[in-house]
Design a protein with these regions (language model features):
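Acidic, polar-rich low-complexity tracts and alpha-helical solenoid repeat scaffolds
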Residues: 1-320
């Protein structure tokens, strides 16, 4: 009879029935824990996640933290909620496992909480659990995955100090692939750039900027030229920009930014006519709706003012 109640997910009815039989009460007290768990587990293994979640929730509320199956019941409950896309409930259960040292589900639980929190833009929480995952990772691949998560959280939190630290740690990994290496270099370079550490940014940008067919590489090529410019090496900046114009890229935004920078270089050299020609050509050929056209207009106005000042100065000198 017990088996029938378990298989039909009516264990509560069975327990209620047996409580009406006095001689079974002692046996029931010791077996109710197992009955409740086994019934919920069966629903889970059959893929009946709504019934499993309900049964496991009842088990956890009634018997835990002292029940025989609390750890695995928490794991099954978390997975059931995850399958049902009830992510807040899933996070609650996975968090219990992630914070329970030494349990066999800790690594997976940390990963789930981190990923779900990241998707909710809760980057500080996500960072914490990615960090926990990196410390208990069972392989270098999983440790790298966790470190990439930490890096992206740091990036989203605009924490440049953390970006530099995490990226540097990630770059020490022996089994890191080229895509992940470039991401780490890119993020660290951007952090250095934001901190005006242009010399350090140059080192990280150089290998990424060799391939401008990616968005990352195209931006790196522009930033490389901009770093040289800020360091006063305008000839090197110009060389990088002219190199960029000869490379094939579909990321016209960063090429346009580079040409605007080239115009700035010409202005610094007092070559105003050439600077204006670069801007006018770009204005006629760049049609995307973004901040490039606004930047062009601003630069042209600045050049016009310089030209007017030069004319005024020339007239004044002639009158002397």
């Amino acid at each position: 009879m017990e088996q029938i109640y378990v298989e039909t997910n009516h264990v509560e009815d069975y327990i209620a029935y047996t409580k009406t039989i006095a001689r079974m009460n002692m046996q029931l007290a010791s077996s109710e824990d197992s009955l409740m768990y086994v019934t919920a587990e069966l629903q889970y293994l059959m893929g009946n996640y709504p019934q499993a979640a309900a049964g496991l929730s009842t088990y956890l509320a009634r018997f835990c933290p002292n029940g025989r199956y609390c750890t695995i019941a928490t794991y099954y409950a978390a997975n059931s909620y995850y399958q049902l896309k009830q992510y807040d409930n899933a996070i609650e259960q996975y968090s219990l496992l992630a914070d329970m040292n030494g349990n066999p589900y800790m690594e997976e639980a940390c990963m789930r909480v981190a990923e779900l929190s990241y998707d909710k833009a809760e980057y500080r929480t996500a960072y914490y659990y990615f960090q926990q995952m990196s410390q208990v990772a069972s392989s270098s691949a999983k440790r790298i995955t966790a470190q990439v998560g930490m890096l992206r959280c740091s990036q989203n939190m605009a924490d440049t100090t953390s970006v530099i630290a995490v990226a540097s740690k990630l770059l020490e990994e022996q089994q890191i692939d080229s895509v992940t290496r470039n991401e780490a270099l890119y993020c660290r370079a951007k952090a250095y750039w934001q901190g005006e550490q242009y010399g350090l940014a140059l080192v990280d940008l150089t290998p990424i900027a060799k391939e401008v067919r990616t968005q990352q590489g195209a931006e790196a090529k522009y930033l490389l030229a901009a770093c040289y410019y800020h360091l006063g090496a305008i000839d090197m900046a110009e060389q990088e920009i002219m190199s960029f114009t000869q490379m094939r890229t579909s990321h016209q935004y960063w090429l346009a930014k580079s040409l605007i920078l080239l115009s700035d270089i010409n202005v610094d050299r007092q070559e105003l006519f050439q600077a204006k020609q670069y801007l006018l050509a770009l204005q006629n050929n760049y049609h995307a709706q973004d901040d490039i056209q606004t930047a062009i207009e601003s630069k042209l106005q600045a050049i016009a003012q310089k030209e007017a000042q030069q004319t005024t100065d020339t007239t004044y000198i002639q009158q002397l």
